[in-house]
């Protein structure tokens, strides 16, 4: 069984869903420490003024928290601003009408926990991209550890024989320990597709909403990479 995982990011990029497409079970790493310098409460979209960050404000607890305990600071009318930015940026996109209702409804709700907002969006995006994969919340496995040891413990709890990692895993995964437990580690080979965009020259590595509104969510990868099971 191929297991992959990632933190539950806000409006994730296309590579997040590419990894999901290749695995059998996808782990949502909701129990790792929140990082404001990452993409857990922010992401990038393309506007007529260039690339812009959309950031969900969070309450500062004064101590490190796991992602699933982070609360949203409902100040500054952030949700309406995010909705207006999406609308102004993409209302001329070919597939705006098809998907915009979901985002309008999402931003009309009041959210308390960041994990609830992010998972609502992730599940909606999975539906639009026609990705049907079981999701497992890391917090539900009741295993402990950090970094490589946590990933290994989670894989063992789920019965993985292949661990699919993003390229960042090369910096921290102890591949030898995985091999000792009978788990093969492979790394995602994701080539960002070039597609028709609005607002000038092509910009890669944006939130997947750019891809969705511009292409309709057509599948960028036609099948699992055979090398994962070789």
Identify what each model region corresponds to.
Residues 1-230:
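Residues lining hydrophobic/aromatic ligand-binding pockets adjacent to catalytic sites
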């Amino acid at each position: 069984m191929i297991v992959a995982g990632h933190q539950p990011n806000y409006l994730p990029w296309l590579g997040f869903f590419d990894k999901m497409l290749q695995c059998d079970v996808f782990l949502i790493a909701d129990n790792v420490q929140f990082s404001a310098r990452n993409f857990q409460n922010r992401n990038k979209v393309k506007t007529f003024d260039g690339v812009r960050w959309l950031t969900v404000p969070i309450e500062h607890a004064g101590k490190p928290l796991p992602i699933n305990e982070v609360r949203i600071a409902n100040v500054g009318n952030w949700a309406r601003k995010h909705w207006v930015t999406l609308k102004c940026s993409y209302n001329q996109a070919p597939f705006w009408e098809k998907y915009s209702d979901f985002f309008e409804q999402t931003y009309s709700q009041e959210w308390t926990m960041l994990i609830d907002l992010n998972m609502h969006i992730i599940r909606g995006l999975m539906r639009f991209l026609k990705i049907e994969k079981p999701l497992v919340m890391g917090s539900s496995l009741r295993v402990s550890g950090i970094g490589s040891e946590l990933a290994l413990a989670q894989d063992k709890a789920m019965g993985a024989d292949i661990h699919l990692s993003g390229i960042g895993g090369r910096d921290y995964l102890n591949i030898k320990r995985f091999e000792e437990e009978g788990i093969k580690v492979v790394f995602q080979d994701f080539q960002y597709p070039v597609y028709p965009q609005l607002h000038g020259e092509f910009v890669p590595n944006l939130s997947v909403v750019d891809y969705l509104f511009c292409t309709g969510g057509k599948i960028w990868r036609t099948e699992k990479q055979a090398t994962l099971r070789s």
